Amino acid sequence: MTPVVLGAGAYRYEVHDAWAKLPPGREFNADVAAVGVDAQDRVYAFNRGRHPMVVLDRDGTFLRSWGEGVFHRPHGVHVAPDDTLWLTDDGDHTVRHCTLDGKVLLTLGIPGSPKPYMSGEPFHRCTHTALSPRDDLYVSDG
């Protein structure tokens, strides 16, 4: 079978459908909304399945999962320079700052309490985060 290649020129990428090697009974049964990669080349697949965060090594081997009961509708992942994760949940209207093993360090927003649309109060379907070089956090909201 001919591999699927996307892109052009120096930016060509080959699709590897079977790259993720999940344990028996585990599967991505919902959207993988975002991915991030830490300094050790571990891949964080933030998904809308039963195990919201699936951690894989660079070869796709399953390492662990976490976030069950914490996340409602995962949306964005940002790996910070200090190897922590900023995770947005647009269904729960929160941003969570977590360690790489899932310990929640900080929650921004009130879980399950959306603010009025366009009110400017955190949050109404927050989507992504970005950190400035001075460590200012920016959040896109819905």
Tell where the protein language model's regions lie, with residue ranges.
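Eukaryotic scaffold repeat domains enriched in small/polar residues
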Residues: 1-142
